């Protein structure tokens, strides 16, 4: 699976670009501020309906325009899918797939499994559990069709339960919703647990390549005491939840724990090793996706030379190549990437002041 064409209009500093893409490694180079990262961001926006650089989508629309337009052609075997997205400054979004309107952004995410490795993505190990839950849920969403419905119901019921807690609703009226919450929470938790187990198996070999002699243990915590029945816990914690105005325990508190011996990886590994660990996690996800549903991820790797030394750049690029995925890599100087490749990239693009040129 790969993107064969990408059209960008009024996105960041790119007024207009029409790109024919390679199905393997695509190298995009240019000075800081040239617009090279905007190409990655446009691909991400097309797959997720949002930016990985800003929570305010209006910021990606060019200053003198009222909308941005993105279009891509996706090829998987003999199947061809055309995806179009238009975002207005008002916040309205129009999405079409093969000419038909798409109502849910999750349809985009399902169609384009995108993995991002940027300087900011290394916060996966430093921030709170939310980013690690999102990491788990990316894989659960793509590999188990029942996950999204159960996850959406957990979110909906938790929101309603928290509103009732803020309104000081008696537990007798909350009890029905707790039963529903427990039902969907158990589905979400089982899928997450199973996914992390499968991911761990794929991760071991990659970590051996990236971090030899480092034994990283990965475990999943579900968000409440595994020895306690969730229904019983919700009832027992009702007074505390009522006082706090929100639900303290549940699948919304799940986490992915990574340790070396008894220490969290943040305390046991150097910054460089942690960067490699995040890369290993992303590659393991891509390989597991291919194994379980025979679908490749699309990797967006921003500013690779500044994050890893030459040897580890070469190792990462080789691992990405081994996945069979389409990869987009940005750099200031092309030599920093070219020197790390065993085979030349499929396509090379130069970006300068928002103008994109193909380098033959």
Curated annotation (Swiss-Prot):
Keywords: ATP-binding, Cytoplasm, DNA damage, DNA repair, DNA replication, DNA-binding, Nucleotide-binding, SOS response. ATP binds at residues 30-37. It is found in: Cytoplasm. Its main location: cytoplasm. Gene3D superfamilies: P-loop containing nucleotide triphosphate hydrolases, RecF/RecN/SMC, N-terminal domain. GO terms for cellular component: cytoplasm. One of its GO terms (biological process) is DNA replication. It comes from the Bacteria. One of its GO terms (molecular function) is single-stranded DNA binding. Belongs to the RecF family. The RecF protein is involved in DNA metabolism; it is required for DNA replication and normal SOS inducibility. RecF binds preferentially to single-stranded, linear DNA. It also seems to bind ATP. NCBIfam families: recf. This is DNA replication and repair protein RecF. It comes from Shewanella loihica (strain ATCC BAA-1088 / PV-4).
